[in-house]
Amino acid sequence: MTRRTLLTCLFLMFTAAAWSQRWKIRPGGRDIVWTVGSDIPHDDHIEMSGERMAFVLRWGVDERGAFRQERSLVFPLLRTVPNNTHASLMYRMATDIPSLLGVNGLALQAERVEEVCIDGALTVRSLWAVGKTNVGSARDTKPLSVVEMTRTVFPSRTLPLMCERYVLRNVGGKPLTVYIPEFSQVVTTDPAKGVTGSYVVRGDLRGSGTFTLAPDDSLSFDAVFQACRSGEEPLRPDVAAEYAARMEFVHGCIDANLVLETPDPVIDTEFRYAKLRAAESIVATKGGYMHAPGGESYYAAIWANDQAEYVNPFFPFLGYGVGNESALNSFRHFARFMNPGYEPLPSSIIAEGDDIWNGAGDRGDAAMIACGAARYALARGSRAEAEELWPLVEWCLEYCNRKLTSDGVVASDTDELEGRFPAGDANLCTSTLYYDALLSAVPLGRELGVKPAQTARYAAQARALAAAIDTHFGGEVGGYDTYRYYDGNTLLRSWICMPLIVGLRERSEGTVRALLGPELLTDDGLLTEQGGATFWDRSTLYALRGIYNVGQADRATELLHRYSQRRLLGDHVPYPIEAWPEGSQRHLSAESGLYCRIVTEGVFGIRPTGLRSFGLTPSMPAAWERMSLRHIRAFGADFDISVEREPRGKLRITVAEAGKEPKIYRASPGATIRVKLTD
């Protein structure tokens, strides 16, 4: 065992002991499992999504060991009145399916959950006894388990329905007669509250009948929850086929691309789950594919921050076709609102593309869109898409340029937190996003044959903006040499991390110290503001990327491990979350995209410099000997990056395109290498 491997093991052991974790990564597997013991009662919630519906499952195990659940069903294509941001049809069902069953003419009783696992579906395995035949001599008889039930909950990939597959196995020594009744629960909504009238929400059992179950034999049946317009026929799906399609998406698509391999299984596994959550939540609307943040609120719509800025630049790396299509579609929608007078673009385009929301004014949306569109276009590696997006990038850059204050920073009404916290007349986020967009626009313009004078102007504007950011926002806050979030700001804010992600290093040491200091850092990541209690994962995720970007891999990895362990194996799993207390830590999906970008842009330091080229600045912690990212699908390619530490401290970096000779580089830690993929 090498010294670094020993350090890694000791660190993981110490961190695991620092707080009790509920879940474990299954040995030899990719899923997480909770083996239920004395750590009950416990409650949690998880969101899962398909192309035509989503659900939040509020589930738990009570003090007796019995499972409970409430299904919050969301149907984004069934619009309600008023048809605004939150107008998806939603309905909750807490139907207790096991209570409907009979075994030997008796009801199931005394459930004891054995384990719960999550792997693209939530699977619960429990043991059941049956009721007593009389109240005489059987009064004090301890119930004996006779049935093992495995229920698996998941969304359809393409249909507006939630599926639950139940498998019953006889664990006793005698045959059982199992009764599965015919059952339907049907609700018709008020026609005045639906854009197209009444909707029908229903839950149905499929596979009803009377069955004899020999010892150790199994049978299966299904529960299906769906909604449709009044007068339409309900769907009668093949639930086994729906489950196979869901697992093909999880294992055949998500697990097959952008595979992270490091000495830290917690980070590797959370990265896998974040890929899934980022990619699954895309709705097939009449306005095209739209990535949905989710959270029982945000569907069939797009936002300048969640989609354009956060998740769209990630999709080319994953290579998920629907993800790329949703990204391009979102930029097309924003481009509809370009105007010669340079009035602000809407913050959000809602209701399947039929309406807009701009209730917070200009949040710096043009900077968000320019930053995301330019990065996406470069990483996508498609000249046709880049040419289509270039006018949007140009327009947004000119808009930001026209919003420069006398101090040379970008003015806006607010920021992506929309007034929840003060942001002044010009905030740090908007200016750094504009700066990042200028950096990307230079190589993108060169690729497209834009006049050199225009790209030179963007480069000059970037240099001027970098100086203005330091002059206007830089200063001492809370005893740290860092940034004010806005003019007059006296409290540390988590968004001081933004200059780090765009390569502005003048105050990097003080900023990292401030981010990791007691004023902001908590067990749940960064507080939004010093002295408060509110946290939003998005700023923690940006900060982690930024700390890697400025070469402080050891400090970043310690925090990334702790954060990943809490989100993956703690009491609320398995994805990054939105915020607390707002939203009760909803599993908004774009945050998972930000988690993945910690790895692609932070740990591996990939910065697109062309449609087939990128800068690569690996930031590997001292405790790791090697790390790899396999089947990267960006730049129109399929390639691996492997980083190994050599005896004298240099890094051996291998870039291997599928079917081509690997390219090997050697570099000092912190050095950037220029990679040009084979045309």
Go through each PLM region and give its residues.
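Proline-centered turn/helix-capping motifs that create local helix->coil transitions or kinks
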Residues: 282-285, 338-343, 401-411, 471-478, ...
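Active-site core of glycosidic bond-cleaving carbohydrate-active enzymes
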Residues: 303-328, 332, 391-394, 398, ...
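N-terminal export leaders
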Residues: 3-7
